[in-house]
Swiss-Prot record:
Coiled coil: none
GO cellular component: host cell nucleus; viral capsid
GO biological process: adhesion receptor-mediated virion attachment to host cell; cell adhesion; symbiont entry into host cell
InterPro entries according to UniProt: Adeno_fibre, Adeno_fibre_knob, Adenovirus_pIV-like_att, Attachment_protein_shaft_sf
Keyword flag Transferase: no
Domain of life: Viruses
Keywords attached to this entry: Capsid protein, Host nucleus, Host-virus interaction, Late protein, Viral attachment to host adhesion receptor, Viral attachment to host cell, Virion, Virus entry into host cell
Pfam family, any one: Adeno_knob
Protein name: Fiber protein
Function per UniProt: Forms spikes that protrude from each vertex of the icosahedral capsid. Interacts with host receptor CXCAR to provide virion initial attachment to target cell. Fiber proteins are shed during virus entry, when virus is still at the cell surface.
Length: 367
């Protein structure tokens, strides 16, 4: 007759024997099971210890996969999805390269040919240009910054005779903006004050020809005593001469105090003048080296006559009505540069309008 063994009501036949199910047991794995990769969870159940990206999916050990990874059916291989220019080569991810890109020193770089360069700290101290691709420019070329970004430009020197026309073409002569000619226009309105305002009109054209200035001048008096010369009733010396002074500052700009109104004097634009007053015309001024201001007492080594041009014009264009013309350079003390026209006659004219013939002259330019 068998005898039934009496056991306690909370006896647990699952290892470890004799412990209640709800008891907190610090270590439950049998001695023949390693704790590496395994765990007792829930208590009393041997399970795998998982860490990302390993997971259990539908009772199977699985791998968590984000975007860009694919598990191939059949082979079970894990592959990487690529989009050009990325590619898989020999089980490695790479970049499909085409000119002008290359890999140098394990880094993606740009192959810069002639005329291009990548600025580094060693080649430029300007922080705004470091690590940027720039165009290398030589003589005659430069770069500009515009609202649309940088651009390459042709460098045109001031006073060099080159400019851009309205179409953007580089031209040696631009009649719309002729910086080689300063003038009053070919037929100006009355622009001078000999005795009273706007009583005469001076036609003056100065054209730069290298180191020389070619000039043309004529004077017509439209009102006042010189519009009808009568030396019988006006025989005084002052009634037989007219002076036209052009005074210029250090930039070659016509100053107040000149006989001519500065609003009539500018660079050429077709048969008129530029709309904006000019700011610099030193290249048209008489050379201070060739025509220095006169010193007192006079220096015998400096010519006292070189700064003058003396000749004749003819009133009304008639050879029997001569008038002496004297052009002096840089004689006026209250200006940096000056050109003065003296008209003087020695005959006694009666009822003759002062209307001089044109006179051409030249002088050495300041620069």
């Amino acid at each position: 007759m068998s005898k039934r063994l009496r056991v306690e009501d909370d006896f647990n036949p699952v290892y470890p024997y004799g412990y209640a199910r709800n008891q907190n047991i610090p270590f439950l794995t049998p001695p023949f099971v390693s704790s590496d990769g395994f765990q007792n969870f829930p208590p009393g159940v041997l399970s795998l210890k998982l860490a990302d990206p390993i997971a259990i999916a539908n009772g199977n050990v699985s791998l968590k996969m984000g975007g860009g990874l694919t598990l191939q059916e059949g082979t079970g291989n894990l592959t990487v999805n690529t989009e050009p220019p990325l590619q898989l080569t020999n089980n490695r991810i790479g970049i499909a390269l085409d000119a002008p890109f290359d890999v140098i020193g394990g880094k993606l770089t740009l192959l810069a040919g002639h005329g291009l360069s990548i600025i580094t700290e060693e080649t430029s101290p300007l922080p705004g240009l470091v690590n940027t691709l720039v165009v290398l420019t030589g003589k005659g070329l430069g770069t500009d910054t515009t609202d649309n970004g940088g651009s390459i430009r042709v460098r045109v020197g001031e006073g060099g005779g080159l400019s851009f026309n309205e179409a953007g073409d580089l031209v040696a002569f631009n009649k719309k903006e002729d910086m080689r000619t300063l003038w009053t226009t070919p037929d100006p309105s009355p622009n001078c004050k000999i005795i009273e305002d706007k009583d005469s009109k001076l036609t003056l054209i100065l054209t730069k020809c290298g180191s020389q200035i070619l000039g043309s001048v004529s004077l017509l008096v439209v009102k006042g005593k010189f519009s009808n010369i009568n030396n019988t009733t006006n025989p005084n010396e002052a009634d037989k001469q007219i002076t036209v002074k052009l005074l210029f500052d250090a930039n070659g700009v016509l100053k107040q105090g000149s006989t001519m109104d500065s609003s009539y004097w500018n660079y050429r634009s077709d048969n008129s003048n530029l709309s904006q007053p000019y700011k610099k015309a030193v290249g048209f001024m008489p050379s201070k080296t060739a025509y220095p201001k006169q010193t007192k007492p006079t220096n015998k080594e400096i010519s006292q006559a070189k700064n003058k041009i003396v000749s004749n014009v003819y009133l009304g264009g008639k050879i029997d009505q001569p008038c002496v013309i004297i052009i002096s350079f840089n004689e006026e003390a209250d200006s940096d540069y000056s050109i003065v026209f003296y008209f003087k006659w020695y005959k006694t004219y009666e009822n003759v309008q002062f209307d001089s013939s044109s006179f051409n002259f030249s002088y050495i330019a300041q620069e």
